[in-house]
Structures are given as C-alpha cells and as structure tokens.
Regions:
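Extracytoplasmic
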Residues: 1-193
C-alpha cells in the first residue's frame, strides 16, 4: 500500500501517435525550433462588450504577459497586444522607440483599425478576440512536462488572476491540460475509488 503514493501518473496526448506520424514530426520541429511541445490557451473575459479596450484590462494583460516572460515553464506567448505592439513598431519603420505596448483604449482601438484595414483576412478571431471585443485569448507554448506540472501551471495561472486581476474571468484550456486533468481523476479513482 505504501507504493501507492510513489505512483506518478502522466498522460501526454501525443504519446498515442506513432513516431512517424505528421503530428509527432510537427511537434518535434516545434520543440527543436521554439522549445514548444504543447499549446495552451488562456481565455480572458472582461465581462463587458468592448472590454478589451479598457485600460484596466490592458494593464492586467500586460502584467500577466510580464509574469509569463519570467515563468520558466512558458517557452512562448502571444496575444492581441503582442501583435498590435509589433504593428505599431512596423508603422514606424521598425524603430524600437515605438516598441512599447499600447496602454490607452484609443491607441489600442487605432491599432486595431489599422490591423483590420491592412488585410481582408484580418478579423477579431485572427487575433484571438471575440466579435464583441469582450474576451481575448493568450496563446502559450510550453515545453514537454509531466501531467502534475501541467496541472500546477494551470493552477498558478488561475491563482495569478485571482490575486492580480479578479475583475477578469480566466480559463486555461488545451488538449494537454485536459488529458492531465482526466488522467489525474482516472488514476485517483482507480486507487482510491
């Protein structure tokens, strides 16, 4: 019975594919080039229409992105603010002077309009926004990690929002997180009942 506590569950959804399958080949390339094994999405709901333009929401997203930058388990992240910041810099011939994240509602709205006009394919959804500009998605790329580490990362993200931006509803999604949670529950049910 003491060995029960030494059991460690791990349920990587990519382990179900053959080594020569296209998804494994693509994942291997992603790991080699970017250190990314799994994609995770963090959906942020401002709870109000056009809420992604609100300065409080913008500050919270930027603060969360700063937290992600410092987090050792996050290899990459991208959001609508990242894209709009890059657009702002490119409009000014790549000058790093213009590399600051937009901070005001009017600046974000102006950059959004510029983004939307630059291509017929540019839509709110292409930036991870909903059509009412109420919610935004931050895409994360994470390296290979155990199911326990994935669940801990999800909990850390939720805790960050509870402590630093309780006005935002945050939810963490992705196939790796789903498999980790299901695997933990199934393993617990097998051993504990």
């Amino acid at each position: 019975c003491a060995c029960l506590f030494l059991n460690e569950y791990h349920n990587d959804p990519l382990d179900y594919f053959a080594d020569d399958s296209p998804i494994i080949q693509a994942t291997d390339l992603s790991e080699a080039a970017f250190g990314v094994h799994h994609p995770i999405s963090v959906q942020l709901d401002s709870k109000t229409r056009d809420g992604i333009y609100a300065e409080g929401f913008i500050r919270s997203v930027k603060a969360f992105e700063n937290w992600l930058e410092a987090h050792p388990q996050v290899a990459h992240h991208n959001s609508y603010l990242t894209v709009l910041t890059q657009l702002k810099r490119h409009v000014h011939q790549g000058s790093l002077k213009w590399n600051a994240t937009p901070t005001s509602a009017s600046e974000v709205a102006d950059l959004w309009n510029l983004y939307e006009m630059s291509s017929p394919d540019n839509s709110p959804q292409s930036l991870g926004l909903d059509k009412h500009f109420q919610s935004a998605v931050i895409s994360l790329g994470i390296p290979r990690m155990s199911s326990s580490e994935l669940i801990a990362l999800e909990q850390n993200i939720n805790t960050w929002f509870q402590q630093n931006a309780p006005h935002i509803n945050a939810s963490v999604t992705g196939h790796a997180v789903l498999f980790a949670s299901i695997g933990k529950q199934l393993t617990s049910n097998m051993f504990i009942g």
